Amino acid sequence: DEEKVNFANALVGETKNISDITISVSIRLGGMVVFAGDEAGLKWLTEKLPKDDRFPLRLMHHAAFHSPLLQHIVPMARAQNPVTDFGPGSIPAIDGQGKIWSPHAFSADAIYAYTLGAQLTETYDFSRAVQVAAAEFAPDVVIVLGPGTTLGAPTAQALIASGWRGLSGKADFQARQQDEPILISMGMDEQRAWAER
């Protein structure tokens, strides 16, 4: 939803002029935005964000992931995980910027720099990763492994936003799920059975 993206970016921009708070977009998660921030920034956000049912919601143990607030972690992570721990890969991987890392087609230094750099300190665009996977690999069905069921809705929202397989909205997606599912969440017993057919 472009309106939400613009609103989130405007909030982050507004904080650039406030010296005692820090916020940034942590994760683009389907139709939701997850923010990262220091304590003062998160309090400020709670006051600024519109109230909607259960939102804004503060995630347990999530404050600074995928944000500049973790910049100090990068040297520690690299000290504990040398580049020699990174191999050529065996299946394609898509990162939080939507880049595909094809097996044997990238340097260990490059994936190391992303994994223990930008992945820690920059926005993780889950929506973009899902959209790139759907567009580039053209799956018959998208299977969400987990954890639990929390990624099903954001995955569906990302697919709808990109018009994957002609999806035009929530009602269209729900109707297609009834006839021949295109998204399976392994965290749901009844959907897990669809994947086992």
Language model segments and positions:
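Short amphipathic alpha-helix segments
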Residues: D1-S19
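Short beta-strand
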Residues: T22-R28, R58
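A generic structural motif
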Residues: G31-G37
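Helix N-cap motif at beta-to-alpha junctions
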Residues: G37-W44
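Hydrophobic side chains in well-ordered alpha-helices
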Residues: W44-L45, A129
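Short, solvent-exposed amphipathic alpha-helical segments in soluble enzyme
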Residues: P50-K51, A110, A158-A161
